[in-house]
Amino acid sequence: PFGNGREETTGRILRMLKYLAKRIGRSLITLFFIISLVFCLMRQMPVEGYFTNYDKLTAAQVQAGIAQLGLDKPLPVQLARFYRDALRGDLGVSHIYRTNVPVTTILAEKIPVSLKLGIAAMLLAMAVGIPMGILMARSNRTRHKLGDKLGTGFIVFIQAVPAAVYYLFLQLLGSDLFHLPMLVTGSATWMAWILPVVSLSLPNIAYYGMWLRRYMVDETTKDYVRLATAKGVKSSTIMRRHIFRNAFVPMVQYIPTSFLNTVVGSIYIE
């Protein structure tokens, strides 16, 4: 019996590893095609885009610049060189943002700020969105459902209005009414983080509130909830010990994805 159990466990592990390898392989192939497509599309833009002072350059200088960038080579050769350098950790140098500064240096300076913003926004989103989802689910069981309606209105607003609109609104409101600084720099005070963190957390607040409310409402229709209610267990106890715990399990799978989306979104905020 023990041997069969071990073989079954080993088989499950192997199947899971095979599944993970398949998913990772597909993701890498997709990433390869996306990067290649973007690379090829970027190479189709006019030559003027590669020079900040194109109108002041002679034809010979333009040709020399194109040769220096390697743009005179066939597209497959350029793509192969790009992947070769990228695998070595060489992403080239900036020609417009910061002239002749390695891209890896620029990223090394900016990524810590993006990660800090993303982590702070995620913590705020969970601290607000999860209680909001709980309150909406509890309000859904009342007669007037006021809290559920207000929360639903907030979620619909955040999802319907373009992010740039309420980013701008928060920026104007925070700077004019509360006199909050708008720039985050290495020497900025903690107040400079309020506007970007709040702006980044709003989509995830709505996201967590919406899904947690849905899962909790679904749990209230289960048989174990009816049984606990029939036994006279308090509604708050059922909500806290049973409904919330079971409803929060599906939420965990969304946290990594939402964190990545938050970090990517911080580029716009910054």
What kind of feature is each model-predicted range?
Residues 72-130:
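An internal, D/E-rich "acidic patch" concept
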Residues 27, 110, 114, 153-160:
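Residue-level signal for discrete positions within transmembrane alpha-helices
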Residues 31-80, 174, 178-192:
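Hydrophobic alpha-helical transmembrane segments of membrane transport/permease proteins
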Residues 34, 38-42, 167, 171-175, ...:
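Juxtamembrane/transmembrane-helix interface segments of polytopic membrane transporters
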Residues 17-18, 111-147, 163, 187-270:
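Alpha-helical transmembrane segments of integral membrane proteins
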Residues 64-67, 81, 85, 105, ...:
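Short amphipathic alpha-helical coupling elements at transmembrane boundaries
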